[in-house]
């Protein structure tokens, strides 16, 4: 769904590539571990150290790649379409390969990976089916696809993905609302079966870092899904 009917903040909005190009410098200072790493750490159906060959779609600055290496992932590639984000990922040295490409059309060989991962990027897609189809194409038989996303609850409450420029001006990055059922439909049509799901809510750790979020206490802010190839 188009986000604009729900937009309460009316920040200037940037296209995705332009937005992340500008945000690259401060991205890791803004995105909290409670948004994504907390949920990844709670996943029970993936043995990261035994995951085989892994692809981090929309890898950004390499935050997730660094976490994956710390969990024992041995073979890891990172892919992103924003050069400025990818340069920071490459500088971390956590990926065997860094690939500049669109995650919906990677150009990578089919059945190349045992596990495909996409974290905090799906809200920028106008439609989900291409993501799930490309992940299915890249995954080997019985492969796994892990998705961690910004919860639609927050988008429906008018809060887009956004950051502050150097001068303090807040700007948003183009976002779309995908219900959790939209993920289920797109995944099933692409041949995936849900193995696990979790949701992260705003709790004390969040509020300690963002006191103004007290008003959102116990609201769902992110989600994780683990899919398996049928």
Regions found by a protein language model. Give the residues of each.
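Conserved class I S-adenosyl-L-methionine
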Residues: 1-49, 63-67, 88, 144-170, 174, 207, ...
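Short alpha-helix
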Residues: 175-198
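A short SAM/SAH-binding and catalytic strip from SAM-dependent methyltransferases
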Residues: 115-128
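Class I SAM-dependent methyltransferase SAM/SAH-binding core
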Residues: 55-57, 61-105
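A short glycine-rich, Lys/Arg-flanked "PGG" loop and its adjoining helix->strand segment in the class I
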Residues: 129-141
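Core SAM-dependent methyltransferase catalytic element
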Residues: 210-230
